[in-house]
A protein has these predicted regions:
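Glycine-centered loop-to-beta-strand initiation motif
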Residues: 70-75, 189-203
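Short acidic/polar inter-strand loop motif in beta-rich domains
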Residues: 91-99, 213-218
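N-terminal targeting signals for Sec/Tat export/insertion, comprising classic cleavable signal peptides
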Residues: 29-60
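Beta-strand-rich domain onsets/edges
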Residues: 22-32, 103-158, 163, 167, ...
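Short amphipathic beta-strand segments in non-cytosolic proteins
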Residues: 54-64, 173-186
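Short, ordered, surface-exposed loop/turn motifs in non-cytosolic proteins
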Residues: 46-50, 167-177
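Sec/Tat signal peptide C-region and signal peptidase I cleavage site
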Residues: 15-23
Length: 239
């Protein structure tokens, strides 16, 4: 199949959007599973209380609570026993662009001369082990793997489907290697929200997508901006 990647570098608007599109994913940090907030290779500090929910999933599809451990500049997560996947939601609050073009973490009514305001929500789905058969959960934005990534290897095809509020989202490109090549994008999703990617890394893989929903009746913001990721780490043999 064709594996055409488009770089948004040629389009100033797309570059600006990508630069602002921080996401979250989970990754091992000193033996713990950390909730990482950043863009590309960036690993930024954040207030751990912004993590609003972490749910573990068993192979049966059952949901279980996960334990969130607040640290000084981030949060760790302890998935439920036997969890094969988990979802994380981080509410980054409302960001308003002032008359000087700079954004502040305040609602529109508190910024004189505000140009625009957006409520930023970050969502992650992490595949922990083989056997995860996830379905859309109805979140504002999510990426669902249509094949078990943990059974694949680098270079293998990985079909995915994008959903917004539980419905397939057509016409959006995905960031195919968000950590290592943060501007590389896939072809756009088809009418069913589907697109076939390929596994980029023999290790941590993070795939991202962004989508905004207008809020015309809300005086404090103009839209809700979602950034969702699908992440997984291919298993390695024992050293």
């Amino acid at each position: 199949m064709l594996r055409q990647l488009s770089l948004a570098l040629a389009v100033a608007g797309a570059l600006t959007s990508a630069a602002q599109a921080h996401g979250i994913w989970t990754a091992q940090r000193h033996g713990d599973l950390a909730i990482v907030y950043g863009h590309g290779a960036g690993d930024d500090a954040y207030k751990p209380e912004k993590v609003k929910g972490v749910v573990s999933y068993l192979a049966s599809g059952e949901r279980r609570d996960s334990k969130v451990l607040h640290q000084a500049k981030n949060a760790l997560v302890e998935p439920a026993q036997d969890a094969v996947a988990l979802t994380v939601i981080l509410d980054n609050g409302v960001w308003t662009k002032g008359p000087d073009g700079k954004s502040v973490n305040q609602p529109k009514s508190q910024v004189p001369g505000a140009q625009s305001a957006s409520h930023s929500i970050k969502i992650n789905t992490t595949i922990l082990k083989s056997g995860a058969t996830l379905k859309p959960t109805g979140q504002g934005l999510e990426i669902v793997a249509l094949a078990d990534p943990m059974t694949l290897k680098m270079g293998d095809d990985l079909p995915v489907q994008v959903f917004a509020d539980g419905k397939p989202l057509a016409g959006v490109p995905l960031y195919v290697d968000y950590v290592n090549d943060g501007h590389a994008q896939s072809n756009k999703t088809d009418q069913d929200g589907k697109v076939t990617l390929f596994v980029r890394n023999d290790g941590l893989n993070v795939i991202g997508v962004s989508h905004a929903k207008k809020t015309p009746d809300n005086a404090e913001m103009d839209q809700v901006s979602y950034f969702a990721t699908l992440s997984f780490t291919l298993p390695h043999g024992e050293d």
